[in-house]
Amino acid sequence: MNFRDNSNIEYRKLDAPLKFINKNYITIGDKDREKYSKILADILEAFRRKMAESDEVYKTFEGAVHYTGSAYDKVKVGKPDEFDLNIVMKLPAAWDYHNDIEVKNSSPSYVTINVKSGCERSYRDPSFLNKYQKGIRIWTDNEGYFIQEQFHAWMEGVVKKALNKFPSHGLEYIIQTNGHAIYVKTKKSGPAVTLQCESQDRKIKIDVDLVPVIQFNNNSSTLWLSPPVRQRPLLCCKKTWCAVPKPKKNNGFTNKNREWRVSFTDQERDLLYNKGRIKNLIRQIKKLKSVHEETKSLPSYYVKTIFLWALDDKSLDQNMWTQWSDGALFMFMLKRLHSHLDENKIPYYWDSRCNLLDALGYAVNNMKYKIQRIIKEIDNSLDNPEVLAKYLLTADEFADFRRRYGSIEEGFESLSIDSAPPVSDLRGDSRCCIL
């Protein structure tokens, strides 16, 4: 059934339960956000100070900490207890991006970085040999290429040296923040070093992923990658982008350790800014996928990417994010997710040669059929809010919904079909259909 054959008015029946679910089970409260953010800031301040004390190379190249991920995009579901932080390393300010640094596209969504020319032109900064040479030597091979494995191993060493400056108890390190003790352990996860933090009473737990990155466009000269990497959208005022030491398996590239994943988190934040209810929608789809075993392994970034492509779709009326009803938007994007799974394709937004779903293998089929069943049942039960709730909530949350929603449903009378404001016709593209 094609999505645009559905009645726009019918999907408004989902508005009230969606608003209730958003408020009670998805949206993070301001108090929780402030509490966890304050704890994170205290941990980070103490930890970065020890990192700078522990390693001269880190102190020399240290840039700002770049907050990334769901928590700071405001699309996090549940407690704000997981944070992604880019630990930015800035290249020498005297280097010119066009003459001293050679960045080339390699495998889809990856680049190589060569700084041999910059090292040879060190006369631009008389103190270069003393100030920068040690770090450059640690991070590069004998041909001047940055090597992600060396860079990542170096950062792990910095983290370990910094932690060793704190008191320890067993396998945990103790960071004192404003009179409170935070117990910290570490683990490796992809390109990140994760700090697993707990309060002394074990009531608060926070995971902090520290990802070391090399930042570009942080000085007077600028460098953007050549096609097929997407050029910087006009809406994006920020020019900085990062190279991430993220390993890529089976890419056929001879020197894969020279490859770095490109990351454009600043631009993605610009693209999602002030786009109506789009962040609510991202949270809803993420909530749904997190509840079901078949879809749990779909990374949240892939969900975000689907929305970036929808914003880029010229066949859509982009006023939809403010004019359509909550129910219509939710079902449209759920069906769009199904279309991507059905085609087994979610292209990386910045380099469409890279299909993100390739990393998931056969799990995509299970996801596709699960989403298809959910769509069919919701479409057939628009008058029953419990069907929608069943697919968006955990068992305990659903039991709570059943107890509470019926007694307050009258409070949503202002959202009834007759009183709801007119909404634009649903115009999905031809891909958004369920077969």
From Swiss-Prot:
ATP binds at S70, E82, F83, D84, K286, S300, Y301, Y302, V303, K304. It comes from the Eukaryota. InterPro entries: Mab-21-like_nuc_Trfase, Mab-21_HhH/H2TH-like, MAB21L/cGLR. The keyword Cytoplasm does not apply. Its cofactor is Mg(2+); Mn(2+). Mn(2+) binds at L311, D312, D317. It catalyses: GTP + ATP = 2',3'-cGAMP + 2 diphosphate; GTP + ATP = pppGp(2'-5')A + diphosphate; pppGp(2'-5')A = 2',3'-cGAMP + diphosphate. Its EC number is 2.7.7.86. Keywords: ATP-binding, GTP-binding, Immunity, Innate immunity, Magnesium, Manganese, Metal-binding, Nucleotide-binding, Nucleotidyltransferase, Transferase, Zinc. PANTHER family: CELL FATE DETERMINING PROTEIN MAB21-RELATED, CYCLIC GMP-AMP SYNTHASE-LIKE PROTEIN-RELATED. Nucleotidyltransferase that catalyzes the formation of cyclic GMP-AMP (2',3'-cGAMP) from ATP and GTP and plays a key role in innate immunity. Directly binds some unknown ligand, activating the nucleotidyltransferase activity, leading to synthesis of 2',3'-cGAMP, a second messenger that binds to and activates Sting, thereby triggering the immune response via activation of the NF-kappa-B transcription factor. This is Cyclic GMP-AMP synthase-like receptor. It comes from Ctenocephalides felis. The gene is cGLR.
